[in-house]
Amino acid sequence: MFTHEHADHTHGIDDLRPLVLHQRRRIDAYADELTAASLHARFDYCFTSPASSSYPPILNLRPLAAGTSVAIAGQGEAIELLPFGLAHGEIVALGFRIGGLAYTPDLNGIPDESLDALSGLDVWIIDALRYTPHPSHFTVDQALEWIARKKPRRAIITNMHVDIDYATLNAKLPPNVEAAFDGMQIVLPG
């Protein structure tokens, strides 16, 4: 799932090659139209094999559109994913709703048409880059305001900049809110 075309969300694409070579099959990747165009422009070798290359393509690019659910097949049952649009500076990034979980990694605003996707959540993973304003990311206070407004059972703040100390932030957060950490596992109800 690609949320948008920025480098911090796309430049790990080459790290998928060993997985594909091990599995001996391409991986399905999902992106909206603008992100897909950007991926093809920068990483076309991941989707097609140039005539001079012995490396196979590694990804099948599948379309995503805000407001249109898609079933993602895997080893178990298909997972129903609902992409929805988010303001991220000058662009629209995607957030994802999967059952009772919402993932909104890069945003500085939530359009009215995306509010329903954030209702009745068990878990909301939400961007909070830093304490001071940023043109394309929520601050900690903005994230907490939205958490208070939408009332998920649990919220996890992610995408924190290096100037946010994990322990200090966690000590200040409401009981149902915590800071994310590398290796964190989230168990969903049901």
Predicted feature residues:
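Binuclear metal-dependent hydrolase catalytic cores
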Residues: M1-T104, D116, N170-G190
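Short, hydrophobic beta-strand segments that form beta-sheet elements in well-ordered domains
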Residues: A102-P105, I156-T158
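Binuclear metal-ion centers of metallo-dependent hydrolases, dominated by the metallo-beta-lactamase
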Residues: G67, P111-G190
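A general structural motif
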Residues: F84-H88, P105-D112, P135-F138
